Amino acid sequence: MAEEVAETISATINATLNETAGNETARIPATPEGMALAYGSLVVMAIIPIFFGAFRSVRFQKEQRENGDTPEIMSDKDAAMFPIIASATLFGIYIVFQIFSKEYINLLLTVYFFFLGVLALAHILSPVVRKLIPDSMPNDPYHLLFVRGKDDKQEELMNYEFDNKDLVCLGVGAVFGVWYLLKKHWIANNIFGLAFALNGVEFLQLNTIMTGIILLGGLFVYDIFWVFATNVMVTVAKSFEAPIKLVFPQDILEKGLEANNFAMLGLGDIVIPGIFIALLLRFDVR
C-alpha cells in the first residue's frame, strides 16, 4: 500500500515537472526588439483613449448643459473615498478567488463583460457609424421604457431611446463580443479594453484640480501598498480573465498573432490620469 502511494506521488510530481518544463519551453524568451515593440505599443494604446476620451468629455459636458441635465461630477469626498472603496473591492475579489473555483468566477465575468463590452463598443462606434450610413437609409426611432407600479406610484426603471443606426453599432459590437467570448484572443481583449478606457475618460468627470490631486495622491498610496506590500494585486490580475487590462505579446516577432508572452497595462493606469487630463482640457475650452 505504501509503495503504491509513493509511486502515485512520484508520478504526480513528475507529471507536474514535465508540464512546467513544457510550458517554459513553449514560452519563447522576450528579445530586446520584442520588448521594445510590446511596451511601445502599450504606450500608444494608452494615449489613444486619453486623447479621444478627453475631447469626447468636452462634448459630453456641453450636451448635458444644453439638455439641462445635472452633470455627475466627482467631489473631493468621492475622490478621498475612491482608494478606500477600491481597496475593499480588490480585497473582496481576492477573497472570492481564494474560496471559489476560478473557472466558474471567470465564466460569470466573461458573460458580464460580454454585454458590458458590446454596449461600450457600440457607444464608441456610434459617431463613426452615423457618418458612414447615408441619410437616405431608413432610421426608425425606438423607445424602450420599463416602469414599476401604476398611476401616481410609477417608478421609472429604464428609459432608453435608440434608432436603427444604434442597432447597427450594437451588431458590430456583438461580433467582437462573440469573438472575445469564444476565443479570448488578446486583440479582442484590447478592443474591449480600449472601449472601456475611452468611456471612462469621457464619463468620469472631476470638478476641480484639487479633486484630481486628492484622487491621484490616494491612488498613488493604493498602488504602492497593494502592488509592493502584498501579492493581492498581482494575484487578482493573473486570475481575473476580463478585459480590464491592455496586453501586447513580447514574442510577437517570433510567434505572430499566436504569441503568449504578454506585457500588460491596467485600465486604471489609463483612465485615472486620463480623467485629470480631460479636466484640464475642459478648463482650456472654457
Feature locations, PLM:
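A membrane-topology feature that recognizes alpha-helical transmembrane segments
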Residues: 1-286
